[in-house]
């Protein structure tokens, strides 16, 4: 079945465009060392390059990805191996894929009632972290001391 769903596109379109986005991200990481680490623009350069009025209809993802290429000079590339101001730990391939799953499922895990799976996995993993760090048992989820971020 390939009908337009709550994705606002058909599932086939979603797959096709999703692969393009993943390829764009992979290409970015393959070439990250070729970008200057720090932004190469002056204040207002990016805004001045944007259209004065919003688009009247949706745009193709190919065009959006081309726009992303144009944005590169206005970015500080925190994940670059040449960026030494802070640790380059803001993201990773597994984290990007996990973000896709989290965003794709649209889960809001603010309470156990809103997503038992989120809450129970979070508390379990944090209990593992307590053990790995050799912290006292009082920081585990079965006490009043912790277990949820």
Task: Locate predicted features.
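N-terminal entrance/gating region of PLP-dependent enzymes' catalytic architecture
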Residues: 1-145
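Conserved core of the PLP fold type I
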Residues: 148-149
């Amino acid at each position: 079945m390939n009908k337009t769903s709550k994705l606002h596109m058909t599932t086939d379109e979603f797959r096709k465009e999703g692969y393009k986005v993943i390829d764009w991200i992979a290409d970015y990481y393959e070439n990250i060392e070729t970008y200057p680490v720090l932004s190469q623009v002056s204040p207002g350069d990016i805004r001045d390059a944007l259209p004065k009025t919003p688009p009247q209809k949706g745009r193709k993802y190919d065009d959006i990805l081309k726009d992303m290429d144009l944005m590169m000079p206005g970015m500080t590339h925190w994940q670059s191996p040449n960026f030494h101001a802070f640790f380059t730990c803001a993201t990773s391939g597994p984290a990007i894929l996990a973000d896709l799953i989290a965003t794709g499922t649209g889960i809001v895990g603010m309470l156990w009632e809103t997503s038992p799976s989120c809450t129970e996995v979070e508390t379990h993993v944090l209990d593992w972290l307590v053990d790995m760090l050799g912290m006292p048992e009082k920081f585990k989820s079965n006490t009043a001391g912790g277990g949820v971020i």
